[in-house]
């Protein structure tokens, strides 16, 4: 009997990439596969996204793993390089990099490299995490244009902080800042990630950087990805390992936090926070068994959860349990837990098996 398994639908991944092509037809697509492709398996997902124009990762180790797996298309380090010692590896493996700090700029200026590196100057338009502040940006850009180790022209990128909140006004201000700086500069531009792709077509520019929507999950709190024509690629499943009679008034699990209001049948599912299921999931969080939703009862344990099957349940040991997937969206589970869908899909542990299918 299988226990915790994440079944990844390659057909859904390909569909989602094509959907982004439809939404941003004039832009190259940077398929963001960082954090193990948001829990979907970086190498397998990258090969499935073979029609993408390039790939985006957070760490040099991720880029090197892609190259070792035979990925030959451009790869950009979205956080940039972390040490001057990384620069020879960027040259050797033909990697592009964000440049967002004076330390990185100085490292590029001082390095002796066999050939220049393609860079993306990161402008801080309002995220205030990484990037060159607007008041220092012209001088920074000028130094990059004069650096012998930088492929010309210099490309420019930024990142939205509230693209999923169109009423906030923040994205308009960030775009205005970005446009003011990039005006007249010859390099490629990139500012839109998932939220920007969905809600801000004027931000698509030369490259878009889809992350979570590639995997069929929405970056928005109030809309599932299906609303925009995307298909969830992950189905997180396990199986019932016990079905038990349970009396009214009896508690379940650590701390006795849930008490049954009736005589019922409980199902014990072989999944827990040791597999990546959220420990914070409260009683009432739904799972899907034999086509119907049943609620979590009691606390999530390391290896198991307990669900209230109902007094007349006919479910049996070995029946499949869907924790989230196309028929029970991860966005709904996130709403129950207070965590984000990003967190849920990326927190799956090594104990959870990844399986790949080419399904409907």
From Swiss-Prot:
A biological-process GO annotation: D-alanine biosynthetic process
Protein name as annotated: Alanine racemase
MF terms in GO: alanine racemase activity; pyridoxal phosphate binding
Modified residues (N6-(pyridoxal phosphate)lysine): 34
Cofactors: pyridoxal 5'-phosphate
SUPFAM superfamilies recorded: Alanine racemase C-terminal domain-like (SSF50621), PLP-binding barrel (SSF51419)
Reaction catalysis annotation: L-alanine = D-alanine
The organism of origin for this protein: Pectobacterium atrosepticum (strain SCRI 1043 / ATCC BAA-672)
